[in-house]
Amino acid sequence: MARTVNCVYLNKEADGLDFQLYPGDLGKRIFDNVSKEAWGLWQKKQTMLINEKKLNMMNVDDRKFLEEQMTSFLFEGKDVEIEGFVPEKGQE
């Protein structure tokens, strides 16, 4: 049986992640409160951010920036702003 969580991003019960994907306390918070669907949405935004801003995951400042964006996106409902990106109709 699939594990369900009350997803803070989607504001509904949904399938939870299979295991903790992010380390530490933030990772536990994500595992306990974020669904697979919401995590997938974040991963798309994360990829766009890394590419647009040319982030280097070996750089501590870039990782910190990405973590701040992830927290804002998943827990505060703030969308990630990506310069020059215009979503297709119906994908907003």
From Swiss-Prot:
The terms describing its cellular component in GO are: cytosol
Domain of life, source organism: Bacteria
Keywords assigned by UniProt, alphabetized:
Iron
Q: Name one GO molecular function term.
A: iron ion binding
Record-linked InterPro entries: Fe_traffick_prot_YggX, Fe_traffick_prot_YggX_sf
Q: Is DNA damage one of the keywords UniProt gives this record?
A: no
Any one Pfam family match given in the protein's UniProt record, by short name: Iron_traffic
Query: Which biological process, per GO, is one annotated for this protein?
Result: cellular response to oxidative stress
PANTHER family, A to Z: FE(2+)-TRAFFICKING PROTEIN-RELATED
Q: What is the recorded function of this protein according to its Swiss-Prot or TrEMBL entry?
A: Could be a mediator in iron transactions between iron acquisition and iron-requiring processes, such as synthesis and/or repair of Fe-S clusters in biosynthetic enzymes.
What family name appears in the similarity comment? Belongs to the Fe(2+)-trafficking protein family.
Record-given protein name: Probable Fe(2+)-trafficking protein
Origin species? Shewanella sp. (strain ANA-3)
What is the organism lineage in this UniProt record? Bacteria, Pseudomonadati, Pseudomonadota, Gammaproteobacteria, Alteromonadales
